[in-house]
């Protein structure tokens, strides 16, 4: 497994994918190869050339060849995905509809399509079409039964406590982030790190392993490294591979203590305090106390607690002490575990980790 952790390789994606053990990755993230339709040089109003997507990697002889290629790599990516893994693909009107068709036929389960709206798109200089101001992202789980990762609360926090929508606005990659050599772009479709940050933060957890089969100049690996995720990337083009390798080596990970994210509320099944008493996890007669150890209470056989003349649930007694209508007793009360003092919520979490 270590062979595929935090490494990138220069080679053919299909050939390398076939060497990877099944169920290796938590997430696949692919910026799609396309069939370019530009066909000839475009001119800006000042008569300078428009750098369309004319890279060698962007050329296929026919739709048939492209379809065969897509089915092959999608099947291989499905094989190397863990059962609860998911896949993101990023594309344009040139290819996203074809790839969506193949994603469903291969057996993935569609979760969302997301619109990346560019607030600084390249204009349509000929004035013959609408300005192409967006790209489409498809997010799908390995199967209908997959318990995929979706960090709902973190996304809501990112969006000022509003549900994150499926239309995202980011600028195209520019400024210092855009890789250039001799004043020219190293890669014509380098994605902005902000876009990948949202994808990776929303659908993976710390230490998850991410595969990018078409790495380009390494944006997926760079963002994965920053966010404490592991990565494996494949890139066929030697120029892009070299640029990605240099870029990844220069990237510094965010300090681990800052990588904590909000947990989803739905991920915590309800466990009554009385259940912990019934199961012997905490015994009747145990002394519990507040964080400063100034207030004490005793646990009764039915899961209630007594503090002086007050008796009731851990929540009601805590609320009465605090002078409020309600209070979270799980975080108010502490107990001794060995030589440590821990909130009683730790006992609940220990129970959940063993039984859920």
For the regions a protein language model found, what residue spans apply to each?
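Intrinsically disordered, charged low-complexity linkers and terminal tails
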Residues: 226, 230, 238, 243-246, ...
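Acidic/polar loop patches that form or flank catalytic/metal-binding clefts of enzymes
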Residues: 148-151, 256, 328
């Amino acid at each position: 497994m270590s062979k595929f952790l935090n490494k990138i390789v220069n080679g053919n994606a299909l050939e390398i994918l076939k060497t990877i053990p099944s169920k290796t990755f938590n997430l696949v993230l692919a910026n799609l190869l396309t069939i370019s339709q530009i066909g000839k040089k475009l001119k800006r109003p000042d008569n300078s050339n428009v750098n369309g997507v004319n890279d060698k990697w962007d050329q296929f002889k026919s739709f048939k060849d492209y379809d065969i290629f897509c089915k092959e790599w999608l099947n291989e990516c499905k094989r190397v995905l863990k059962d609860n893994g998911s896949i993101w693909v990023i594309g344009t009107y040139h290819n996203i509809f074809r790839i969506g068709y193949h994603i469903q036929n291969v057996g993935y389960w569609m979760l969302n399509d997301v619109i990346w709206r560019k607030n600084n798109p390249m204009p349509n200089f000929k004035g013959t079409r609408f300005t192409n101001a967006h790209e489409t992202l498809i997010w799908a789980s390995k199967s209908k039964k997959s318990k995929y990762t979706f960090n709902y609360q973190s996304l809501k926090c990112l969006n000022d406590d509003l549900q994150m929508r499926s239309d995202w606005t980011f600028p195209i990659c520019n400024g210092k982030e855009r890789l250039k050599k001799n004043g020219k772009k190293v890669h014509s479709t380098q994605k902005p790190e902000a876009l990948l940050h949202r994808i990776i933060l929303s659908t993976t957890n710390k230490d998850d392993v991410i595969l990018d089969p078409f790495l380009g100049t390494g944006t997926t690996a760079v963002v994965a490294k920053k966010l404490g995720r592991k990565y494996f990337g494949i890139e066929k083009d030697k120029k892009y591979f070299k640029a990605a390798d240099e870029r990844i080596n220069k990237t510094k990970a965010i300090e681990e203590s800052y990588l904590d994210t909000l947990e989803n509320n739905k991920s915590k099944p309800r466990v009554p305090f009385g259940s912990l008493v019934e199961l012997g996890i905490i015994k009747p007669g145990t002394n519990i106390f507040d964080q400063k150890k100034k207030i004490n209470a005793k646990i009764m056989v039915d899961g209630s607690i007594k503090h002086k003349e007050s008796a009731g649930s851990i929540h009601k007694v805590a609320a009465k002490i605090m002078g409020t209508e309600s209070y979270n007793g799980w975080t108010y009360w502490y107990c001794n575990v060995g030589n440590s003092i821990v909130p009683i919520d730790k006992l609940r979490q220990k129970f959940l980790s063993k039984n859920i």
